Amino acid sequence: MAPSIKLSTMATSLHRAHGTSALLRRPRLWAPRLSSIHATPTIANLRASFTTSSPRLFAPNGSAKDESKPAVSTVPKTTGRGPSDPLAAIDKTAQEQRKADWAIMKEMSKYLWPKGSWGDKARVLLAIGLLVGGKVLNVQVPFYFREIVDSLNIDFSTTGGSVTAVAGAMILGYGAARVGAVVSQELRNAVFASVAQKAIRKVARNTFEHLLNLDLSFHLSKQTGGLTRAIDRGTKGISFLLTSMVFHIVPTALEISMVCGILTYNFGWQYAALTALTMVSYTAFTILTTAWRTKFRRQANAADNKASTIAVDSLINYEAVKYFNNEAYEVGRYDKALAQYEKNSIKVATSLAFLNSGQNIIFSSALTVMMYMGAHGVATGQLTVGDLVLINQLVFQLSVPLNFLGSVYRELRQSLLDMETLFNLQKVNVTIKEQPNAKPLTLTRGGEIEFKDVTFGYHPESPILRDLSLTIPAGKKVAIVGPSGCGKSTLLRLLFRFYDPQKGAIYIDGQDIRSVTLESLRRAIGVVPQDTPLFNDTVEHNIRYGNLSATPEQVIEAAKAAHIHEKIISWRDGYNTKVGERGLMISGGEKQRLAVSRLILKDPPLLFFDEATSALDTHTEQALMENINAILKGLGQKGEKKTSLFVAHRLRTIYDSDLIIVLKEGRVAEQGTHRELMERNGVYAQLWRAQEMLMTEEGEVSKKGEKEEVGEKKEA
């Protein structure tokens, strides 16, 4: 099973982003470009076109680009409510960042207190109850400690008695309070886990669903590595944000308030004022410093996305890397991105050291002053030693949540940044939408397709189709031919509503496709692309993808109809054979026959074949075309023959079409049957003769080579 060969890294990356139809026009083995047929075709010219010209890539702006030159993206930027690039690192002012943070927290509060979900609300309330109970028990611990110290401040040799009699009850109370606080904390975590995980699932699912619903232009302009990395970090941030909101920020504020109240009541306002001042200073320093550090983390995230994207692209395009000996180049690209990540991560680490040092200085200074005040009270007889211990324990007990709050705030900022990217993805506008009153597509005429005065360009200022009008009769086999960039594959994208035309309309049986539901429209169209997108799963799964409810018997019948069954059962694992990433473990011809099997299983009334036999040898191509023609003659659910469109450069594969439409410069140059077009002696006739001449010469060259090889063997 030879792997299919990809001609460039751009080919595979564009295919991966596209996922539905091939974006590239492979160099034809013997079919010359229609764009070159204006001159009288000669054998010398035809040979030169294949031996000296670079492969040409299909350009969305309607032109053909030389692959030897650096490719420039022609995909329009995503427009809508979200940013043009939701993955980009955008520096914001402090006010803008706070506004964005509050918007995210407001959004997440919906998941914290979900409407209609009384079970989740009960869990949140129970978690809060356990939280308050745990904090109350935690604050009781220093009081037990004070009583133990004061009760033991006696001369046991004089008074007699034992530790159990003097402080036993308080020691048990001390232990019970600590155990109760810990148990409450763990129960709280267990109760709230369900709420957090449900939120993660909902956000991740909504984001994934939104990505699948986004326009083709978005996926052409984004790289999978960066998207998956952003989703991964964002979903992890959700759990931390919800947990920190409920279990860290609110509890710490509650504990600080309780400690300040206790200090004021027992020892005077001075202790409470010093504690409050310390907390305010600590919090302000943490917030300001973390806000300053945010830009370093954002830059590190951008570098991380870049490195992940490069790694994924290089591994997916493994064969292309090997074909051109570019391992060192790819490693260099990856290392360059890692170097940028290293640079920004060092800034993150050094600024973190500054933050930690400042926090410890503030807290330690305040604790030192408070201990001096307590020691002075003991010396003057106003306080007992137990009171000094109580003050120390109460304030020092705040160090744990405060230190944790510092790290929580840092991680909270990180989570908010990650979630900002995630929610920005959800804000990217979907431009291809159903009308509110959209109805299912109904084929009342058998599937007649009409393009009426259609003008479209990926860039509006550079239209590919210009006032294009054509009709594809219902139940007929129609071929679309023309030079690369004339809009052949664009017809499918418009028909499938990946894009809407800037002008004009497209009708199926008289129904404007913009007025029907997307689900019914796309279910009615079956596609066999030039480069078949396959999942890294079994052969059976990839065929069944055309109809997920199909039985194993139906899968086998579809494979037989596509002339791939015998090949599949010859493999060791048969239909359970894994095809590899994008089907790289099987040949291009096998991939295309799997695509035909998938189409047969879907059984749609409208069929689109985009160079569907380009990777097949002549014998297999002929057999498969005969089988496809037999399928086309099959009747649909209502008795109509299937309407089929073939995009082709090999004219021998479509000469028997009921109608052949030749596109040129975004318009219909001519149309008719093969006989009519040959009699007209126009563009189509020139191309046909050019291909026939080339095939004749190639046959002569092949025979000459065989004779020379036989002669050499005889001489030997």
UniProtKB/Swiss-Prot annotation:
Gene of this entry: fes-4
Source organism (scientific name): Neurospora crassa (strain ATCC 24698 / 74-OR23-1A / CBS 708.71 / DSM 1257 / FGSC 987)
Keywords: ATP-binding, Membrane, Mitochondrion, Mitochondrion inner membrane, Nucleotide-binding, Transit peptide, Translocase, Transmembrane, Transmembrane helix, Transport
A GO cellular component annotation in the UniProt record: mitochondrial inner membrane
InterPro entries in alphabetical order: AAA+_ATPase (IPR003593), ABC1_TM_dom (IPR011527), ABC1_TM_sf (IPR036640), ABC_transporter-like_ATP-bd (IPR003439), ABC_transporter-like_CS (IPR017871), P-loop_NTPase (IPR027417), Type_1_exporter (IPR039421)
CDD domains reported for this sequence: ABC_6TM_ATM1_ABCB7, ABCC_ATM1_transporter
Keyword Manganese: no
Keyword Cytoplasm among record annotations: no
Positions in coiled-coil regions: none
Protein name from the UniProt record: Iron-sulfur clusters transporter atm1, mitochondrial
Functional note: Performs an essential function in the generation of cytoplasmic iron-sulfur proteins by mediating the ATP-dependent export of Fe/S cluster precursors synthesized by egt-3 and other mitochondrial proteins. Hydrolyzes ATP. Binds glutathione and may function by transporting a glutathione-conjugated iron-sulfur compound.
Segments in the Mitochondrial matrix topological domain: 19-123, 193-241, 288-353, 410-716
Sequence ranges assigned to domain ABC transmembrane type-1 in this UniProt record: 124-414
Region (Disordered): 57-87, 697-716
Binding site for glutathione: 293-297, 356-359, 406
Molecular function as annotated in GO: ABC-type transporter activity; ATP binding; ATP hydrolysis activity; ATPase-coupled transmembrane transporter activity
Pfam assignment, any one: ABC_tran
Transit peptide: 1-18
Major enzyme class: translocase
